[in-house]
């Protein structure tokens, strides 16, 4: 028990000092699935997201899976027609789309016109900055009431949340989640890292 406490303390401290990898490349330790667990598989060191709607919520020890001011970067590859998303400031929900936080869109060729790094339904971009079947870095920073998204270092969204927003889609302490959108979508995540500020 003492060793577990020391490990958790170290992970929490080290997350404040550097980037911490949340995917281990072997299994889904530290993550919790909703709706359709089979939509999330680890294959050849990558998280493969393919199947019916579901969400994979980070539920591990880093930051006690509740982040306030933080950065996330993920290495992502989409396949033709795929749609996914990376939620921030969210909370576990057993069914349906997460009702808290914001979704950062992952979509380079799906019929939904909102493209990768859009702050879904809030600040959307139709510009396609990366292509299917190539790895790219998706970066998100949440600080105070400010969200920034980038693709391969290029800023896509620079959003300041209006004062007084109290419900649903708002910046609040929470976890991150990866979306399985539909059975025709296939996305791979090679790395998901977080840095607590």
Language-model regions: role of each:
Residues 17-197:
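Carbohydrate-interacting regions of secretory-pathway proteins
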Residues 1-3, 17-18:
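Absolute protein N-terminus
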Residues 3-13:
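Sec-dependent N-terminal signal peptides
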């Amino acid at each position: 028990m003492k060793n577990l406490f020391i490990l958790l303390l170290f992970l929490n401290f080290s997350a404040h000092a550097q980037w911490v990898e949340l995917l281990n490349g072997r299994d889904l330790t530290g993550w919790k699935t909703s709706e359709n667990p089979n939509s999330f598989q680890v294959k050849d060191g990558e998280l493969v997201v393919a199947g019916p709607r579901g969400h994979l919520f980070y539920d591990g020890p880093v930051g006690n899976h509740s982040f306030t001011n933080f950065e996330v970067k993920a290495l992502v590859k989409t396949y033709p027609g795929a749609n996914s998303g990376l939620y921030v400031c969210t909370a576990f929900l057993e069914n349906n789309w997460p009702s808290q936080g914001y979704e950062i869109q992952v979509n380079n060729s799906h019929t939904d016109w909102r493209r990768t790094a859009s702050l879904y339904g809030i600040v959307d971009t139709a510009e396609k900055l990366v292509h299917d079947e190539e790895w790219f870095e998706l970066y998100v920073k949440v600080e105070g009431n400010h969200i920034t998204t980038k693709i391969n270092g290029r800023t896509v969204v620079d959003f300041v949340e209006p004062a007084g927003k109290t419900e649903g889609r708002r910046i609040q302490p929470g976890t991150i989640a990866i979306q399985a959108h539909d059975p025709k979508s296939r996305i791979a995540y090679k790395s998901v890292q977080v840095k607590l500020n």
